[in-house]
From Swiss-Prot:
SUPFAM superfamilies: Hypothetical protein YjbJ. It holds the Pfam family CsbD. Residues 1-60 are annotated as: Disordered. This is UPF0337 protein SSP1897. Belongs to the UPF0337 (CsbD) family. It comes from Staphylococcus saprophyticus subsp. saprophyticus (strain ATCC 15305 / DSM 20229 / NCIMB 8711 / NCTC 7292 / S-41). Residues 23-60 have a biased composition (Basic and acidic residues).
Length: 60
């Protein structure tokens, strides 16, 4: 799952850069949204992993 969120961030960065270079504000905005979505997924995944680790420690 982490790979998917990183890929989404990279894809967003490429779109944002391409939109900036081509002066395409829609593509640039779409890239920013993809980056933000990927980052949010990454943060959520990290939090979920920490909660699961904590639960595993409680079980021991």
């Amino acid at each position: 799952m982490a790979d998917e969120s990183k890929f989404e961030q990279v894809k967003g960065n490429v779109k944002e850069t391409a939109g900036n270079v081509m002066d395409n504000k829609d593509l640039e905005q779409e890239g920013k949204e993809d980056k933000a979505s990927g980052k949010a997924k990454e943060v959520t995944e990290n939090a979920k992993d920490k909660v699961n680790d904590f639960i595993d420690k409680l079980k021991k």
